[in-house]
Amino acid sequence: MAQSDITIDALDKVGRQDAEYLVSLVRSIPGFPKEGIIFRDFIPVFADPKGLRILLEALEAALPVPASEFDSIAGLESRGFLFGPALAARMGKGFIAVRKAGKLPPETIGESYDLEYGSARVEIETDAVQAGERVLIVDDLIATGGTAKAATDLIDKVGGTVAGYGFVMRLEGLDGIDKLGGKPVSSLMAMPA
């Protein structure tokens, strides 16, 4: 599928030329991880210093809530790990790792969820979030909303509060944002599912 199927949402906050440059780095891979899925790969952004700079600037410019309204950033494995810590460092915030099951040392708490192509489970360490801590959840993609909803449930279980969500990409037509309880959401670009 051509890159022309990607529309720019909040990327215009960094300028049209930079936004188009960033979109040009996103690869569309049909049939991965299974037939009928078009995988949107933005890993090439991280190999490109200009692309990475634009990505971080755009994410910060498009925050769904002011930085004063959250204390830390939770990144969802795996691509949320690639930009979440850099964004947190830019903003003077801590970073929380939301990992796939079995990847963290005990004690952990987990939540199962459905993906657009299967099911999975995520975990956090039970002391990763302090009572009353306000958390911004970030990830590369919102599709069905299952991963972000599971992360929300985990943060709630350990006494934190989700302030909002920031995504690089949003798949249209899958209604994932509807699962996020009406909390503020931003995405940089959108594309058909």
From Swiss-Prot:
Localization: Cytoplasm
Gene Ontology BP, a term: adenine salvage
Reaction(s) this enzyme catalyzes, per UniProt: AMP + diphosphate = 5-phospho-alpha-D-ribose 1-diphosphate + adenine
Purpose: Catalyzes a salvage reaction resulting in the formation of AMP, that is energically less costly than de novo synthesis.
Keyword annotations: Cytoplasm, Glycosyltransferase, Purine salvage, Transferase
Keyword Glycoprotein in record: no
Primary location recorded for the protein, binned into one broad class: cytoplasm
Xref: NCBIfam families: apt, PRK02304.1-3, PRK02304.1-5
Annotated metabolic or biological route of this protein: Purine metabolism; AMP biosynthesis via salvage pathway; AMP from adenine: step 1/1
Enzyme class: transferase
Pfam families: Pribosyltran (PF00156)
GO CC aspect terms: cytoplasm
HAMAP family cross-referenced by the UniProt entry: Aden_phosphoribosyltr
PROSITE patterns: PUR_PYR_PR_TRANSFER (PS00103)
EC number: 2.4.2.7
Subunit and partners: Homodimer.
Originating gene: apt
Similarity-based family: Belongs to the purine/pyrimidine phosphoribosyltransferase family.
GO molecular function: adenine binding; adenine phosphoribosyltransferase activity; AMP binding
The protein's name in its UniProt record: Adenine phosphoribosyltransferase
